[in-house]
Amino acid sequence: MVLLLQYTLIFASVLMLVALGGCFAERSGVINIGLEGIMVIGALGGALVMKFLPVSLGAPLMVISTILAAALFGMLFSLLLAVAAINFKADQTITGTAMNMLATAGATVAVKAMNTAASGGNDVSSDISYVHSKDLFLVRLGSFEFSWFMLVAVICLVVSYVLQIGRAHV
């Protein structure tokens, strides 16, 4: 049961940050249905950067590089929605849905192609050397461990809620 709770907290933090971004986008008048696709492309970019970084780089620098690459890939992919909606006056809902499908399919094809090329024709996942970088993502309280992204997500959630409550009374 504890393991289930740990993994729930680890994976929920990313989804909480994406949902919070969606709330801010909605408040500004943008219907960003493409958030899931942006998240997938960001994850793909982070994984690709981690795969091709040298093993001797060191865990802290590898984690920072991976997070920055994931953010950059996500921002570049989200630029598609901005260009389509602003420059081409495309419907945001249709474009966001198309971006989600494109991201999921594109990430699947990219990962399959990389794994097939790395394994010599077999469709087997290749290894990524983590160099103990998992320890940099975790906060330990006794035997219970959770991602520090969860702390960041909860802090962002509380701050945005407090700011929203403050605006409601003005």
Which role fits each region the language model picked out?
Residues 5-8, 12, 37, 64-72, ...:
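Hydrophobic alpha-helical transmembrane segments
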Residues 24, 48, 52, 76-79, ...:
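Membrane-interface helix caps of multi-pass small-molecule transporters
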Residues 56-104:
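Alpha-helical transmembrane segments within multi-pass membrane transporters and channels
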Residues 103-166:
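Transmembrane helix-bundle core of multi-pass membrane transporters
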Residues 12-21, 37-41, 76-79:
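Hydrophobic alpha-helical segments embedded in the membrane of multi-pass proteins
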